[in-house]
């Protein structure tokens, strides 16, 4: 009898301890922002993201910043603990030799040990938000490119996906069409495609301010589920392209979007203060964490006639 009671106690203690490892089943969603290098203003991006998520109230946010020097020892010591989180927001971008420090090129990729940990995290069920220019990153890292699906690449690098005027997806093979690019930033009419949980309850279309629409994003393009699309502003082109999509990798979920352009010198840009963006980010994180998508659709969510830009993001500065 004593042994049986002891066994019951051990089972209860183990059950209580299990949520501490891997994904949490209740409580706040644990989010890790990974930053440290980009051609965009990664420092301000992190501050703005933290401000949005802390205001939402259901996220526990941490940050892991890549070393700010080129010493091998510093990089060897950098090892983000991905497994301790439900979702990783990846903001790093090494595209175009964007150095960590001024004048330092080429920009580094993550160390092999960090890459391995990241792949294992997603494969086992972790969620990843590929934030804006992180879609450009890590040319040649096969697993990362599979997760992202569509990246900033040359014309012959992979398949592109565009959307027809009737809302049908059209796959463009390598070498057909152009390399990835974008026209001038502008107020963009975003249209939903389908009825994904992230967009449930949202209008079918809305205006998003100061936005880039990437054309001819390319990659493996496997398991890509396009959630929303918009027309690019490139003169003489004006086709429809994905601006939000999801993929899967192993048991993990991945969400990619071009929302959130924060250029160097921008302060509290409209791209981040958009009511649509500040609604969709928490909803995407809920979905990535495997939770029900319950974050409310904002009363000031924009329609098709005007953008909806909020005041300064709280707690960010």
Residue ranges of model-derived segments:
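Bacterial N-terminal signal peptides that target proteins for export
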Residues: 1-8
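Non-transmembrane alpha-helical segments in soluble domains
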Residues: 50, 119, 145, 199, ...
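An acidic, glycine-rich "communication" segment
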Residues: 130-234, 297-317
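Boundary at the C-terminal end of the N-terminal hydrophobic targeting segment
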Residues: 20-22
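Short, solvent-exposed loop/turn segments at secondary-structure junctions
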Residues: 38-39, 94-96, 135-137, 204, ...
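Helical hinge/lid and interdomain linker segments adjacent to catalytic or ligand-binding clefts
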Residues: 28-138
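Extracellular ligand-binding/catalytic regions of CAZymes and related secreted enzymes
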Residues: 24-29, 44, 55, 80-83, ...
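Bacterial N-terminal signal peptides
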Residues: 8-17
